[in-house]
């Protein structure tokens, strides 16, 4: 086998990717461009068999160690190849090892998009379910060592995710949701939640939502510079969009006014009936209905005053939720999401994600929606897990992270030094938050 550099032949690279079941946006040259605007460099490679046919695709990122001419090579969610063919896999990685050694790489890290064990979306492993242990054995036999298992967000990429197959039988994707979730989406629309695509000029709006979400959920948010870079590289190629949900208070006011008018009409009707009734039980029942309507009428009047105030403050509507979704072929990844704290029960996030699904289904032929990461740690991540679970997706566990040593000395040096550097970085970030 031999390596073929594909930076100037991207159509051929993508043509091979399209034939592979474990293809992913993170192994595209376009994703590599996003990362090379920072501290990484990039290679786009095909591994060719002796008959000159491609058997593997590898978009490899390189990160230089400080002070020395040595690099960590990383194939995000890659490489893309057949992991069931053990002998071919050994040859693929043997060829890559020779190539990477010449590039002064001391090790190769992979975390392929391969499903390992079967789970329910309630975070329970299915007894007797499928177990693609063959993948793991073949990777180890090809010269890799396995990194410690992490079922949270501490890996380079999330090991657990939730994926929803998208279906529309003519009535819309929302109609495939259960009754409770359909109700939430429909109420959001009635309450004035409007969804739309943003542009690069809207990046500061997303950044504000992002800061709110990061502070609330205690994580380090992606910077506006990184998100802008991602958008600038991928949007012209049709691979990312920025989406928003806002509250149109004109719609909300009309909804609240309609509820008040309906309640007032019912109140007037019942009070008129009360004068003609003789049956004590019937009178008592109508009086209870009237009292209940009085409470609702007062509530609706108060709500109308609140909405009028919101309308005066936000005449163009208030943005309450945003999301970045990347796409490749027939798959979408819900990469980043942000929202205000407490949207008054509007379910704007639910409405936004549902609208994104339908838009991508109709416009791009997307048939699989990856929520991109959940955690087994329900105590700290129950909120985000619960939101994603509510769509009734499949919980997917990927095979994990593996490292192939190329230079044993530098490989061991890196894995001794790197955890200490990450720990120091996290301490600095915590201090900055305080």
Predicted region positions:
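Residue-level preference for alpha-helix termini and adjacent loops
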Residues: 25, 30, 64, 78-79, ...
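Juxtamembrane/interface motifs at transmembrane-helix termini
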Residues: 76, 225-228, 355, 418
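Acyl-donor binding region in acyl/amide transferases
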Residues: 68-154, 275, 327-391
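Active-site/acyl-donor-binding loops of N-acyltransferases
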Residues: 7-10, 33-34, 122-169, 288-289, ...
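Short amphipathic alpha-helical segments
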Residues: 71-77, 160, 191-193
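Low-complexity, flexible helical/coil segments
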Residues: 5, 38-41, 93-98, 109-116, ...
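A conserved beta-strand-loop-helix scaffold within acyl/acetyltransferase catalytic domains
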Residues: 5-51, 55-68, 117, 143-155, ...
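Extreme N-terminal starter segment of soluble prokaryotic enzymes
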Residues: 1-3
């Amino acid at each position: 086998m031999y390596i073929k550099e594909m930076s100037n032949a991207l159509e051929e690279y993508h043509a091979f990717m399209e034939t592979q079941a474990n293809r992913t946006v993170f192994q595209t040259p376009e994703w590599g461009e996003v990362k090379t605007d920072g501290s990484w460099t990039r290679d786009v490679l095909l591994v060719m068999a002796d008959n000159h046919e491609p058997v593997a695709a590898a978009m490899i990122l390189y990160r230089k160690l400080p002070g020395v001419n040595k690099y960590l090579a990383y194939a995000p969610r890659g490489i893309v190849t057949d992991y069931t063919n053990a002998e071919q896999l050994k040859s693929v990685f043997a060829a890559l090892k020779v190539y990477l050694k010449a590039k002064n790489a001391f090790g190769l890290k992979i975390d392929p998009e391969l499903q390992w064990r079967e789970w329910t979306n309630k975070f329970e492993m299915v007894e007797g379910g499928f177990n693609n242990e063959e993948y793991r054995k073949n990777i180890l036999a090809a010269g890799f060592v396995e990194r410690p298992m992490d079922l949270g967000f501490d890996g380079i990429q999330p090991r657990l995710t939730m994926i929803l197959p998208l279906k529309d039988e003519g009535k819309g994707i929302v109609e495939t949701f259960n009754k409770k979730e359909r109700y939430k989406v429909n109420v959001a629309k009635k309450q004035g939640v409007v969804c739309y695509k943003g542009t690069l000029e809207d990046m500061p709006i997303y950044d504000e939502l992002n800061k709110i979400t990061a502070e609330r959920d205690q994580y380090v948010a992606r910077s506006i510079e990184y998100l802008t870079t991602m958008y600038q590289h991928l949007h012209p190629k049709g691979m990312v969009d920025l989406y928003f949900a806002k509250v149109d208070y004109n719609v909300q006011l009309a909804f609240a006014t309609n509820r008040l008018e309906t309640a007032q009409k019912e109140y007037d009707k019942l009070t008129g009936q009360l004068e003609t009734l003789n049956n004590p039980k019937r009178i008592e029942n109508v009086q209870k209905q009237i009292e209940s309507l009085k409470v609702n009428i007062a509530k609706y009047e108060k709500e109308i005053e609140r909405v009028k105030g919101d309308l005066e403050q936000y005449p163009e509507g208030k943005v309450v939720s945003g999301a970045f979704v990347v796409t490749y072929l027939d798959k979408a990844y819900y990469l980043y999401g942000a929202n205000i704290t407490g949207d008054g029960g509007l379910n704007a996030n639910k409405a936004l994600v549902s609208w994104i699904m339908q838009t991508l289904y109709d416009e791009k032929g997307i048939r699989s929606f990856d929520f991109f990461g959940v955690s087994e740690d329900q105590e700290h991540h129950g909120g985000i897990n619960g939101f994603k679970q509510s769509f009734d997706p499949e919980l997917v566990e990927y095979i994990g992270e593996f490292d192939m040593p190329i230079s044993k000395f530098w490989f061991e040096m890196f894995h001794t030094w790197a955890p200490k550097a990450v720990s120091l970085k996290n301490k600095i970030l915590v201090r900055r938050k305080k």
